[in-house]
Swiss-Prot record:
It holds the Pfam family Ribosomal_S2. GO terms for cellular component: cytosolic small ribosomal subunit. It comes from Shewanella amazonensis (strain ATCC BAA-1098 / SB2B). This is Small ribosomal subunit protein uS2. The gene is rpsB. Belongs to the universal ribosomal protein uS2 family. Signal peptide: none annotated. GO terms for molecular function: structural constituent of ribosome. Keywords: Ribonucleoprotein, Ribosomal protein.
């Protein structure tokens, strides 16, 4: 089972919250105290809560579930994409478009258009167009890829959301809540934990902390997927030699 230790979290700076004047009182149970005007998060809470979240992620993946990694702020976007790709899951790393989950029918049409343009860009269709028309389609393709590239092969709504920055991604969390999709989210001291099923109290700005979360989540998803493949192999009559 994938787990993260307190030492890992301390080294990554998970315990450093926001300045005390920006705090959200709903995070009080998870705050240890303050140092130099900055809230310190109580890792005695974070460690077991994150490990519980990782067990949940692993369980979702073991049932062939789809996990959507969400992190659109600059500090998180690269790590979110890398983690999702590494475990064959899905991601939104640029901008959350309102209705991405709650208006899936419309999003599906945009994904269809994205795939059409991808095909046209490689099958010679673009070469037959005027320069202006080809440029317009290339720009449309780039725009759609930026927004929907991480979910174009999701094939339906996800079974869980893994979110970096509950405050920044509040629209995504609200949409998931409306649809009954469970949410795992890193919640800093300035954010509200409302609507988050698996709260991970921690720093959501430091690159090292973000990478700790995303890499652990990807490892947990891979471990879960491995369990699924092992069960499948057993059912198919393939048992790995000791």
């Amino acid at each position: 089972m994938t787990t993260v230790s307190m030492r890992d979290m301390l080294q990554a700076g998970v315990h450093f919250g926001h300045q005390t004047r920006y705090w959200n009182p709903k995070m009080k149970p998870f705050i240890f105290g303050a140092r130099n005007g900055v809230h310190i998060i109580n890792l005695e809470h974070t460690v077991p809560m994150f490990n519980e979240a990782l067990a949940f992620i692993s369980n979702v993946a073991s049932k062939k579930g789809k996990i959507l990694f969400v992190g659109t702020k600059r500090a998180a976007s690269e790590a979110i994409k890398e983690a999702a790709v590494s475990c064959d899951q899905y991601y939104v790393d640029h901008r959350w478009l309102g209705g991405m989950l709650t208006n899936w029918k419309t999003v599906r049409q945009s994904i269809k258009r994205l795939k059409e343009l991808e095909t046209q860009s490689v099958d010679g269709t673009f070469d037959k167009l005027t320069k202006k028309e080809a440029l317009m389609r290339t720009r449309e393709l780039e725009k759609l890829e930026k927004s929907l590239g991480g979910i174009k092969n999701m094939g339906g709504l996800p079974d869980a959301l893994f979110v970096i920055g509950a405050d920044h991604e509040h629209i995504a969390i609200k949409e998931a809540n409306n649809l009954g999709i469970p949410v795992v989210a890193v919640v800093d001291t300035n954010a509200s934990p409302d609507g988050v099923n698996y709260i991970v109290p921690g720093n959501d700005d430091a690159m090292r902390a973000i990478r700790l979360y995303t890499e652990a989540a990807a490892t947990a998803a891979k471990a879960g997927r491995g369990q699924d493949l092992a069960v499948q192999a057993e059912q198919d009559g393939f048992v790995e030699a000791e």
